[in-house]
């Protein structure tokens, strides 16, 4: 079997946890293609080492990655439009001699990947979107991040509004909503209004459901690999592969084979030392 014909393994949120990544890599087949679901950096003890390792894997042709909310936060801090939070662990990247090169690489990564029938995003997709819509909307954001005016773009890219999709949205509102859906979404209403405050898997606000449980979701039937939701943990359904199993919180780092047939989705997990206290995070 050639490398190109081997199904990739999708890997959950790293968040700067390099040691578990190294352990996981030794447990995977040496030639297995890798797909990272985003949040490569932040909150863990070695954001710099983690990012450099992922870049090495990607530039070597073995891996691909999508951007998560923590990755975009790093871009904004590097651009000077956001400040570090008290639990951020990004100083090692920002102070690295190759910081500019690392940021350049990061801002050229996609927000969505569709290959071999599998869609991959960091957080979720809105129920009104088709797979084609996801790729088109993600592409518009990607062009801004890769452009010479990327710092100016990020100045206006943050905020919770608009929270509801409309095909009439234009400009920065359309781009901001796209970023929020692809990198922050957990719960939404059946008509696609997003809610960003609730993280507990069993704590759905009134009128809201997990994005993947919305009746009539237009991507239903297309397998989607995602991360972002550590309190929900491993999600294994015919058309869902949720891989954030809380490595940075002392959970596990998870890889799963991305096969269209659910029976082929072998799961490999390694234990992680706790780098952040989830209870302190909620205070």
UniProtKB/Swiss-Prot annotation:
Q: Decide whether keyword Protease is in the record.
A: no
Q: Does the keyword Hydrolase apply?
A: yes
Pfam families for the chain:
Metallophos
Q: What class of enzyme is it?
A: hydrolase
Q: Name one GO molecular function term.
A: bis(5'-nucleosyl)-tetraphosphatase (symmetrical) activity
> Which reactions appear under catalytic activity for this entry?
P(1),P(4)-bis(5'-adenosyl) tetraphosphate + H2O = 2 ADP + 2 H(+)
Organism superkingdom:
Bacteria
Entry EC no(s): 3.6.1.41
User: Which InterPro entries does the entry link to?
Assistant: ApaH, Calcineurin-like_PHP_ApaH, Metallo-depent_PP-like
UniProt keywords (A-Z) are: Hydrolase
HAMAP family the record matches? ApaH (MF_00199)
- Tell me which family the UniProt entry assigns to this protein: Belongs to the Ap4A hydrolase family.
Its biological purpose: Hydrolyzes diadenosine 5',5'''-P1,P4-tetraphosphate to yield ADP.
The protein depicted here goes by the name Bis(5'-nucleosyl)-tetraphosphatase, symmetrical
Q: Which organism is it from?
A: Ralstonia nicotianae (strain ATCC BAA-1114 / GMI1000)
Q: What is the lineage of its organism?
A: Bacteria, Pseudomonadati, Pseudomonadota, Betaproteobacteria, Burkholderiales
């Amino acid at each position: 079997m050639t490398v190109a014909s081997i199904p990739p393994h999708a890997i959950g949120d790293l968040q700067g946890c390099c040691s578990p990544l190294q352990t996981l890599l030794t447990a995977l087949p040496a030639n297995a293609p890798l797909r990272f679901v985003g949040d490569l950096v932040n909150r863990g003890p070695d954001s710099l080492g983690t990012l450099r390792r992922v870049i090495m894997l990607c530039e070597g042709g073995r891996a691909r990655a999508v951007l998560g909310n923590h990755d975009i936060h790093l871009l904004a801090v590097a651009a000077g439009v956001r400040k570090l939070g008290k639990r951020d662990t990004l100083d090692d990247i920002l102070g690295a001699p190759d910081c500019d090169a690392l940021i350049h690489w990061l801002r050229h990564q996609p927000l969505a990947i569709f290959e071999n029938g599998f869609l991959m995003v960091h957080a979720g997709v809105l129920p009104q979107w088709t797979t084609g819509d996801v790729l088109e909307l993600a592409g518009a954001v990607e062009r801004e991040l890769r452009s010479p005016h990327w710092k100016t773009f990020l100045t206006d890219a943050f905020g919770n509004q608009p929270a509801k999709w409309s095909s009439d949205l234009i400009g920065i509102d359309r781009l901001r909503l796209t970023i929020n859906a692809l990198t922050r979404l957990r719960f939404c209403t059946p008509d696609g209004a997003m809610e960003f405050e609730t993280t507990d898997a069993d704590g759905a606000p009134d009128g809201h459901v997990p994005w993947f449980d919305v009746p009539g979701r237009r991507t239903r039937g297309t397998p989607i690999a995602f991360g972002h939701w550590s309190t929900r943990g491993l999600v294994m359904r015919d058309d869902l592969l949720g891989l954030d199993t809380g490595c940075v919180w002392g959970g596990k780092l998870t890889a799963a084979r991305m096969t269209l047939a659910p029976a082929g989705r072998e799961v490999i997990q390694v234990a992680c030392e706790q780098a952040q206290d989830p209870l302190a995070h909620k205070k």
